[in-house]
Swiss-Prot record:
Catalytic activity from the UniProt record: Endonucleolytic cleavage to 5'-phosphomonoester
Gene3D superfamilies: Ribonuclease H-like superfamily/Ribonuclease H
Location of the protein in the cell: Cytoplasm
Any one GO cellular component localisation term in the record: cytoplasm
Positions with a binding annotation for a divalent metal cation: 32-33, 124
Species of origin: Solibacter usitatus (strain Ellin6076)
SUPFAM superfamilies the record matches: Ribonuclease H-like
UniProt keyword terms in alphabetical order: Cytoplasm, Endonuclease, Hydrolase, Manganese, Metal-binding, Nuclease
Family annotation (Pfam families): RNase_HII
Molecular functions (GO terms): manganese ion binding; RNA binding; RNA-DNA hybrid ribonuclease activity
Main function: Endonuclease that specifically degrades the RNA of RNA-DNA hybrids.
Stated family: Belongs to the RNase HII family.
Protein name per UniProt: Ribonuclease HII
Gene Ontology BP, a term: DNA replication, removal of RNA primer
Amino acid sequence: MRPIPAGGKFRCEATLERELRARGFRAVAGVDEVGRGALFGAVFAGAVILSEERPIRGLNDSKQLDPERREVLAGRIRERAVAWSIAAVDASTIDSINIYQASRMAMRIAVSRLSPAPDFLLVDAVPLEFAVPQRALIKGDERCHAIAAASILAKVARDECMRVWDKVFPEYGLASHKGYSTPEHYRAIEQYGPTPLHRLSFEPVRAHSRFPLDHDRQLDLFDTAGAA
């Protein structure tokens, strides 16, 4: 199904989920990705089936929430949701297949990990290749509770990952800018060159790359960060 055209400001609510449940769907999943525009690290995706009996107040696009509020809501989502999952696709894969396809891959993986399996998908912006009815919503994380919940989980998980990587690569300020395009990040790339976990197909990273991406080195670095 094609994305629904955007129409100005939206109010984030559970109207769509209620309408779908009224039509007989019982496992409506929201799906969203985070980190698509970053220069460093994986793109993350979340998938969430919210509980009708245990609603969560205050859900909204993760970008509109401060970090403390996101953490609180992420805890409530993990506690109250019928099912939730998070997936990540690393920088080497992003460089191999492009960020659009990598984002879709992360979302597909997140959906495939849900138990129970969803019977309807509400996806932010892009439809996915699933034999399940779905609806793609422009600015879905601003207008749909389930998509907002997926966005929050993915954002919190990715931010935590950036804090871990900041200990491995302290020169780059990852805990601050989370791998996105900032003057601080640009200066670090210019001074030190990109790490193996930067997206080498992205500008300005490509212009300062001093080595080909070494996938085995990436895996070693993931092990190092996991032990940090």
